[in-house]
Amino acid sequence: MMLLIDENLPKRLKQDFSKHQIYTVNDMGWNRKKNRELLKLMLNKKFEVLLTFDKNLQYQQNFKKYPISVLVLNVEDNTYSTLKPIIPLIHELLNGELKAGPTEVTTRI
């Protein structure tokens, strides 16, 4: 599965998803792209999942146009140590049937 890590997340996350083809926005040279343009680029390159900390993205885009799964990591901050506890949840989602559009990933009850 091809995954893209948004520029608002630590690139260190790549090590936790080595079973997948995983790239950062920086790896692809897509820094500072607007969300709509980023989603179009992802479609062209056959990416299937975007990992992001951008909680507004899910309200700003029409996901009928972009059949990409977006995992919105909803935690206190975007540091690796804060993200680490939700990595197993992300793996569960990736191993299941992901729907197109946003899915919030959080540890909050």
PLM feature spans:
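Short histidine/acidic/glycine/proline-rich micro-motifs that form metal-
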Residues: M28-G29, L57, E76-N78
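C-terminal structural segments of small proteins and small subunits
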Residues: S69-R108
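N-terminal first-folded block
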Residues: M2-K45
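Acidic, metal-binding active-site segment of PIN/NYN-like and related structure-specific nucleases
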Residues: M42-F63
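Small/polar loops that bind or transfer phosphate-bearing groups
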Residues: I5, L51, N74
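Short, glycine/charged-enriched secondary-structure capping and boundary segments
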Residues: F17-H20, L38-L39, K64-I68, P85-I86
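Short glycine-/acidic-enriched loop or helix-start segments at secondary-structure transitions
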Residues: K14-Q15, Q60-N62, T82
